[in-house]
């Protein structure tokens, strides 16, 4: 911290930090005051969190203004942990504590024996340390092996031996994570995974604001905001959160996935690493939209377990892999910029298959097959959104006559365009469309998009190697059908 801050208890008393308004203020009151100030100034409440302005954020604000402990319920990849970590932006820039205290003792009201003795012995000369907001945030992932000692504390025989203390001395306590979060925020992720007997240990903290250390007749009056996260399936169906603990959680806030493709694209653009340190990257809007729609299609696919959710990380890692495949091609061909294509989305299948949990029917088909279907449906939806007036019958008929087209994802934009030019009318259609064709790279992306739409509608086929050809259904005289999706 800066040298201008008081270094002793006496100096602290004479500073603004020793005023009646600041002295003894709880962390919940601190968060409340800073939140009200931010609302009044019109500043973003939780920087970097998008899409919750009209849903989650108002509920979060109400919980904090009410000084509630709260829980965020949501599927994976819904920014729950990010929201909790953003709470530190509502803390004061600096907090005075007694130097050397394990539990962030307030010099005006120390809760530990160490802190009380330090103030009694040194008085106004008691040294003061200053904590930054990040130092006041303690996060723990709940797992079945977490014990009460981990969270609350326990006897430390080694500390007793080294200090020459009796085992009954309060100085022999090894404090757990909760006491170490005193005057701060304690976040517990995946609360249902915490054993029931450990959840019981949180009762006193949430209701009376204190903890009792096993084997010691002492109470620590903790000042802490408790924030939890959980999966709705665990929280409701499995019943892993014991009822008395549920009753003590002041507010229950539901998170959700982005409601629109545009919003999801903004989140992915913010989070994905696309600005590489070599060649410049030009990401076509079509590719970005198809990449994002893959996640939307996955969330509507009945062969994917929707109880597990489809994380926003799918879109983020998928886009990063798409750019990487395009980067590999650009470097190998000596191109001046990196321009991803739809073929690069197929090359990024590992970013999809690892993030979807399949139902039994999906397991029979395989994740890779379903992932390819998701890409095709995403491309079809993108084309329909951008230009649903295109007549593709001539192109389909050309393939129906037994023609085929293979364009490698390793080919340059010029070579790929020449390949697509062999399909009668294809380049003319994309040039006259609303797809924004300005150069060879744009033309290749537009041609891919136009061909992917009839593949999704099963009027054409696309092999794993990327060869377009006649649909198997049309080959046998069967009418094409659109793949089923869950509404």
Language-model features: locations:
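Acidic-glycine-rich active-site phosphate/pyrophosphate-binding loop
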Residues: 292-296
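Conserved ASCE/P-loop NTPase catalytic core
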Residues: 2-262, 273-289, 302-306, 379-487
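C-terminal catalytic subdomain
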Residues: 362-389
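C-terminal helical "lid" subdomain and adjoining coupling/linker elements of P-loop NTPases
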Residues: 277-284, 297-371
């Amino acid at each position: 911290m800066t040298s201008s801050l008081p270094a002793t208890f006496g100096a602290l008393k004479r500073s603004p930090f020793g005023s009646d308004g600041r002295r003894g203020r709880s962390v919940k009151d601190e968060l409340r005051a800073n939140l009200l100030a931010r609302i009044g100034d019109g500043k973003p409440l939780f920087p970097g969190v998008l899409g919750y302005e009209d849903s989650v954020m108002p509920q979060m604000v109400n919980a904090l203004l009410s000084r509630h402990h709260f829980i965020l319920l949501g599927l994976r990849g819904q920014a729950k942990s990010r929201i909790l970590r953003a709470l530190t932006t509502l803390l004061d820039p600096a907090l005075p504590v007694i130097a050397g205290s394990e539990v962030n003792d307030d010099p005006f009201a120390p809760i530990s024996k160490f802190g009380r003795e330090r103030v009694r012995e040194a008085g106004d000369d008691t040294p003061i340390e200053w904590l930054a907001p990040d130092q006041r945030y303690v996060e723990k992932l709940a797992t079945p092996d977490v014990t009460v000692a981990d969270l609350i504390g326990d006897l430390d025989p080694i500390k007793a031996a080294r200090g020459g203390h009796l085992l009954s001395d309060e100085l022999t306590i090894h404090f757990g994570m909760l006491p170490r979060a005193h005057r701060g925020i304690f976040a517990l992720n995946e609360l249902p995974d915490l054993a029931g007997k450990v959840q019981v240990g949180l009762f006193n903290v949430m209701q009376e604001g204190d903890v009792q250390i096993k084997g010691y007749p002492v109470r620590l009056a903790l000042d802490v905001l408790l924030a939890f996260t959980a999966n709705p399936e665990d929280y409701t169906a499995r019943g892993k959160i014991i009822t008395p603990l549920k009753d003590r959680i002041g507010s229950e806030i539901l998170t959700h996935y982005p409601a629109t493709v545009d919003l999801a694209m903004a989140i992915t653009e913010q989070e994905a690493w696309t600005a590489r340190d070599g060649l410049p990257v030009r990401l076509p809007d079509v590719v970005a939209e198809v990449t994002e729609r893959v996640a939307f299609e996955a969330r509507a696919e009945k062969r994917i377990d929707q109880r597990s959710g489809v994380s926003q990380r799918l879109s983020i890692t998928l886009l990063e892999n798409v750019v990487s495949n395009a980067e590999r091609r650009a470097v190998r061909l000596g191109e001046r910029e990196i321009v991803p294509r739809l073929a690069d989305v197929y090359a990024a299948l590992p970013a999809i298959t690892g993030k979807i949990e399949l139902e039994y029917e999906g397991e029979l088909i395989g994740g890779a097959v379903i992932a390819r279907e998701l890409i095709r449906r995403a491309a079809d939806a993108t084309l329909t959104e951008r230009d649903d007036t295109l007549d593709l019958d001539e192109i389909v008929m050309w393939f129906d006559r037994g023609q085929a087209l293979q364009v490698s994802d390793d080919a340059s934009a010029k070579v790929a365009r020449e390949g697509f030019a062999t399909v009668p009318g294809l380049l003319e259609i994309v040039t006259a469309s609303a797809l924004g064709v300005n150069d060879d790279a744009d033309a290749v992306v537009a041609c891919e998009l136009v061909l992917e739409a009839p593949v999704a509608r099963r009027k054409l086929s696309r092999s794993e190697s990327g060869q377009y050809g006649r649909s198997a259904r049309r080959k046998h005289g069967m009418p094409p059908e659109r793949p089923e999706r869950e509404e």
